[in-house]
Every structure is written in structure tokens, then in C-alpha cells.
Amino acid sequence: MIEFIEIIKSIIFGVVEGITEWLPVSSTGHLILLDEFLKLNTARDLGAAFAEEYMSMFEVVIQLGAILAVVVMFFGKLNPFAPSKSAAEKRATWSLWFKVCVASVPAAFIGIVGDKLLEKATGKDIDGWIYNAVTVAAALIVYGVLFIIIEKWQKNKGGAVESVDAISYKQAIFIGCFQTLSIVPGTSRSGSTILGARMLGVSRPAAAEFSFFLGIPAMVGASLIKGYGFFDYVSESGVSVPVLAWVVLAVASVVAFAVSMVAIKFLMDFVKKHSFAPFGVYRIILGALVLIYFIPKMV
């Protein structure tokens, strides 16, 4: 019975990840909140330290399911070896990949080098300093307001850049710098990159699409780092990870993949007719609710 309940919980986590990873509303923020109300007990019998390590890994690694959805849905566009593509189309695909790689450098530097330097200097990594409810709420609200402001500012302007292929390397780097902001929980990786793109006048569909592609190296890299860290912890502690813990992780990842397919299709259809402002309103409301719920518990 306990195993069944944990699997049901993992399905819920997968659904939330699949929806919120691609909508600009912060998947990490939602998973933090979900863990507050619906804790996975899969690893808690092995102690608080192990449970914390497991959940930290779980919340990142299930993103692999979500990112696989992007690869599947945009495989034709992302595959430079497709025999049906002309030489010019193949060059355009390689150019897109180079832009994605270049745009990923700032976030990779901050996420790996900056995190290590901070931990060495203070004894705590970035998560240790900013991973809390107040930070999540503040980020939700601040970026919600920014979405509304930028969408209003761009309302009467045509998209200067109508496709991802038209994004320049300079613009790609600018958008990549915005991705570094997502290191703050509650910001939203997709939200920060979409904001950066919209500030440059990139059309909504192109901004969303480029954000999806930027997620591939970012999320694969983060998952590998977290996964390695977890296995290193398990190796040093000598803890035997229960089979249920792996089953729960696998189920959540598969569900995240399936739900992501729907969420991506929804967002691409939505932004062809509407602005990102409704997501800004949602973020502000959610941020306020987080403050109302958590502040009394912290006093």
C-alpha cells in the first residue's frame, strides 16, 4: 500500500514538472511547494540527510523526462543530419546548435564555477543561501511584474526577430546571460530566457522555442551534476538505495515526458494569439499566496 501511494505521489510530481518546466512559472518553485504539502517518503526511512540528498537529485533528474519531450517534438528542426534537409538547411541547423551552446556558457559558468567558489568561501553552495520560501515568493512576484511590463512595452511592436534562425550570436549570448538568473529558485529558467528574448524584440513563438532549445544543455548538465553528486554521496555513506526510490524517479520522469509534450504544444499555440502577461499575473498571485502561507511559519 505504501509503495502504491509513493508511486501516485511520483505521478503528481511528474505532472507538475511537465507542466511548469516549459511554462514561465518556475518548475523548481512549484516542486518546492509540492514537497511541502505532498512529501515523498521513499527515502525518509534512511534518515534526513539521505532524504534531502535524494529529493535534491530527484527534483533535477526528472527534468530529463521533460527535456526529452523537446528533443522528440523538435527533432526534425534540431537534427542536422536529416537526409531530407538541403545543405543550406543543415548549415542553419548547425548554426542554431552553435548559438545554443554559446548562450549556455554564462549559466554553465555561474552554475559550476560560481557555485564551487561560493561553497569554498562560505561553506555553503548557492542553494544553501537562497533555497527558501521567501526567495521563491519574491522571484515569482518580481518576474511576474516584469512579464506584464515587458509585454505591455512590446504590445504595439512587431517582432524584430520572427524565428530562432534569425537570432544573432550577440542576441543569443544576451538571452543566455538572462538564463543565469534562473539560479534563483522561483525565477523560472524558461521565464528568464523568454524575458531576455522579448526585451530584444524576439517574437513570442521564437522566444519560447529558443528557450526550449536552451534547456537541453542546461538541464542535461544539471541532471548529470546532481546525479553524480548523489551517487558520490551514496558511495561515501554506504547507504543502500531502495528499489522503490528508483521506481519513483523513473515513473516521475516518464510522466514528466508525457505531460511536457502537451505543455509545449499548449504554450506554442497560446503565444501565437496571446501575450505572456497572464503568466505574470499567475506568478504574482502564487507569490503572494506563498508569502501568506510561509511567513507565519518562519516567525
Predicted segments, located by residue:
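Multi-pass membrane proteins that catalyze or facilitate reactions on polyprenyl-/lipid-phosphate substrates
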Residues: 1-299
